[in-house]
Amino acid sequence: FVEGDVEVRDEVLYYKGKHRLHGVVVDKLLDMLRSGMKDSTPITNYIGRLMNNPSSNSVDELYTFLGYRSLPITPDGKVLGYKGVQEDYWSNTGNADTIVVQGQTNDRHQIYNGVGETIEIQRRSCDDNKDNHCSHGLHIGSYDYANNWASSNGKLLLVEFDPQDAVSVPTDCDFQKLRVSKYKVVADISDSRQELD
């Protein structure tokens, strides 16, 4: 199997012929190949985006986050996740030291997460140490994690992030949360509170 920069030889996945890859995404691609996969484009696009991530630690940690639940991958290789925010779409917390590149903040340094908003911070404003559990950065979570943050009166959002913007997967919460430097709010699912397949 060869598609773009992704090649499978003897049940091993390579990127650009030399980088041997592993983890839940590789397992998923191999399973899809074994079952007569019809469209590998989302997975191969995801791998290409992942390999653009400047941190090898971030790449390895992202596998653990995606391994918790198979979060959906879009046709262009981005990943869908969840975010819990306040009823008025402002983040639950704010940080005066976070350098916001794109997005609206208030006087408490919270970030507005309305549908259609793209939120971006400088990558160095996002803690890359997975052992720092409650720390600075933009947080995305599994359905369960984000739904807990949304609580009964908050908003549960569907967000999309590029694997190249993943920074760290904190070791607490059973790898259910991820810190990123950028994401886009794609939908408010507060009324349905329905987890994607």
Language-model region placement:
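Long, low-complexity intrinsically disordered regions
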Residues: 195-197
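ADP-ribose/NAD+-binding catalytic cleft of ART/PARP-like enzymes
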Residues: 20, 24-133
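An N-terminal, globular interaction/scaffold subdomain
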Residues: 1-13
